[in-house]
Amino acid sequence: MIEFDNLTYLHGKPQGTGLLKANPEDFVVVEDLGFEPDGEGEHILVRILKNGCNTRFVADALAKFLKIHAREVSFAGQKDKHAVTEQWLCARVPGKEMPDLSAFQLEGCQVLEYARHKRKLRLGALKGNAFTLVLREVSNRDDVEQRLIDICVKGVPNYFGAQRFGIGGSNLQGALRWAQTNTPVRDRNKRSFWLSAARSALFNQIVAERLKKADVNQVVDGDALQLAGRGSWFVATTEELAELQRRVNDKELMITAALPGSGEWGTQREALAFEQAAVAAETELQALLVREKVEAARRAMLLYPQQLSWNWWDDVTVEIRFWLPAGSFATSVVRELINTTGDYAHIAE
């Protein structure tokens, strides 16, 4: 298995170094649900601004304030503790009376707005996130500048970030131990983290091998192609390669890579043979995913940051803004820009 730090770069290994998250204000995340509260219903959507506290901690504090069980407060995704983040929480509070959430007080947390909503906010039910990052102590400004320009055109590898694998790769190591011993894992959180790490590592490996090819975005026979921004996909055939290549070049279609698991991976012929060869040595992790009935899926191979802009405060400090769809990692963008000091694993997804 390729170590995360050794995964293939799309734009070559960065020449410069820099510091990511010198302080929480250097990593700002604003959650984009893609919809507005209904204005009625038994749930309350609460938009919060937090700094220095994790999502679960705030959710538990909100439940205590509302005098409801912690399981009645949900969220679309975890946000980093060591960052300034805006996100929505959802509390189930039936009844016509609206509680005064302006009275909710928690150090490092502020209620920005709240409104009634008809449905529970479920994990993953967001459109994406807007990021504002500040990179400090940047060396080789010219290299970083050129990479930003290139990323606007060619994107970055859609790798799962190091945080998916846990501090020191602990989640992936747990998955490997589980696969090797076949000992039942009772803890539901561990099961989820370990299976996710296993599948993510296999995806990263497939993408890393594909990036070694001369023309990364060249459609091959049997590729599974996805409409940009959609989850559905279809298989490329030799008769239509030229037209499909044009649509890929126009970013209308995206080449996908496998999220291995049980069932068919989705690719066929040449593309399927390539993917199978890329992870052929990882038989234990593949067997674990099949045994635990984790269904195979597809994920875009490349990621195109939207609304990408940047501003150099001085020769060694740059502010970068961009928007990413749900499930994508800001650290996978930063990885193509600079060699960062520190460990990504503490940064929440």
Swiss-Prot record:
Active site positions:
80 (nucleophile)
Q: Which UniProt keywords are listed?
A: Isomerase, tRNA processing
Name the chemical reaction catalysed here: uridine(13) in tRNA = pseudouridine(13) in tRNA
What is this protein's name? tRNA pseudouridine synthase D
Task: Tell me which Gene3D superfamilies the record gives.
Answer: TruD, catalytic domain, TruD, insertion domain
Q: What would be an example GO MF term here?
A: tRNA pseudouridine(13) synthase activity
**Enzyme Commission number(s) from the entry:** 5.4.99.27
Query: What SUPFAM superfamilies has UniProt attached to this entry?
Result: Pseudouridine synthase (SSF55120)
The record's family statement is: Belongs to the pseudouridine synthase TruD family.
Annotated coiled-coil positions are none
Offer one example of a GO biological process linked to this entry: tRNA pseudouridine synthesis
Q: What is the role of this chain?
A: Responsible for synthesis of pseudouridine from uracil-13 in transfer RNAs.
Residues involved in substrate binding: 27, 129, 329
Q: Pfam families, per this entry?
A: TruD
Isomerase listed as a keyword: yes
The chain's disulfide connectivity reads: none
> Gene Ontology cellular component?
cytosol
Specify the TRUD domain's residue ranges: 155-303
